[in-house]
Amino acid sequence: IYQLSDNGTMAVVLPHGVLFRGASEGTIREYLIKEKNYLDAVIGLPANIFFGTSIPTCILVFKKCRENEDNILFIDASKDFEPGKNQNRLRDDDVNKIIETYKSRVEKPKYCHVAPLSEIAENEYNLNIPRYVDTFEEEEEIDIKVVQQDLKRIDKEIAEVDKELNVYLKELGLEEI
């Protein structure tokens, strides 16, 4: 970052751990955000897109001359990829979606969030993406009455199969179940 010109932009690919680990990494995050305000965006990438490692990675975008000084953009692109046998791949559409989201800085539910610096301070400079981008999916409600009916039907089918099986076992001279 020191080598970056005053109007330069730098993007760094790192493992997700740098977003939330404590100790010196936490101190560095706080310094880069609170003291210098260089961090412009955090982009979460899918796991297994880089050769030789399956860990999820992220891109940190730094700018010394930020246009949006009061917030940081969080993008969760971890679900947008083409699965591969040995390695996952970002498609052109996936990359374009990231770029367009970065340029527009518009909130998209379950994909990106523009977090004010106060929110990041409240989270003690922990940049873990799920703290900022809610990706929780509601589970479908289970109708207990339907499940009970299914269980009764299945029990009845099992009883019929057992009855038929006992006929065959009896014919073979074997003990019934």
What are these regions (language model features)?
Residues 1-177:
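A conserved structural/catalytic subdomain of Rossmann-like adenosyl-cofactor enzymes
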